[in-house]
C-alpha cells in the first residue's frame, strides 16, 4: 500500500532561508557544545547541542532566541574540518540523541546529558578536534616534503 511521504516541518523564515543556501562545511571553523539547563528531561538530565559554525558566539545568541532559553557555552574548539569533527561527535554520542522542538533550526542535534556526560562531551570534542587537526598538519607536511623533494633534488 502506498503511503504519502510525511512533509518536513516548515521552519521559521530565517531558518528556512539558511537551509536553502548551498554551504560547504568541510572547511576550517568551530565546533561547539551549548548547554540548555532549562530543558529538563528527568532528574539531573538536561540537553546539550553539538553543532558547527564559523561564528559560534553569534550562533549561541541566535539559538538562545530561537529556543527561548539562555544557552551556556560549554566548549568551542577550532578545527580544520568542522563538518567532519561534528559528524564524529554525533556518532560518538548517538545513543543519547534526542530531538528538540521540531521545526526549529538545529532541532536534531540535541543530546540528553547529565553532568558527567557534559564533561565527557567536552573532553571528546577536544580529542577529536586535536586528532583531525593533527591529520591535517601531517598531510600538509607530507605535501611540502614531497614538493621540496621533487623541486630541489
Language-model features, listed with the residues they occupy:
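Non-catalytic accessory segments flanking enzymatic or RNA/DNA-binding domains
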Residues: 1-153
Amino acid at each position: 500500500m502506498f503511503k504519502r511521504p510525511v512533509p518536513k516541518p516548515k521552519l521559521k523564515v530565517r531558518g528556512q532561508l539558511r537551509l536553502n543556501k548551498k554551504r560547504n562545511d568541510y572547511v576550517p571553523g568551530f565546533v561547539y557544545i551549548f548547554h540548555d539547563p532549562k530543558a529538563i528531561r528527568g532528574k539531573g538530565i538536561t540537553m546539550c547541542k553539538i553543532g558547527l559554525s564559523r561564528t559560534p558566539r553569534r550562533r549561541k545568541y541566535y539559538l538562545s532566541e530561537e529556543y527561548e532559553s539562555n544557552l551556556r557555552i560549554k566548549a568551542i574548539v577550532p578545527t580544520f574540518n568542522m563538518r567532519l569533527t561534528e559528524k564524529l561527535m554525533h556518532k560518538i554520542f548517538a545513543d543519547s540523541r534526542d530531538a528538540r522542538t521540531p521545526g526549529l533550526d538545529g532541532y536534531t542535534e540535541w543530546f540528553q546529558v547529565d553532568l558527567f556526560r557534559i564533561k565527557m562531551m567536552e573532553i571528546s570534542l577536544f580529542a577529536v578536534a586535536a586528532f583531525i587537526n593533527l591529520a591535517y598538519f601531517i598531510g600538509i607536511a607530507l605535501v611540502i616534503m614531497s614538493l621540496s623533494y621533487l623541486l630541489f633534488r
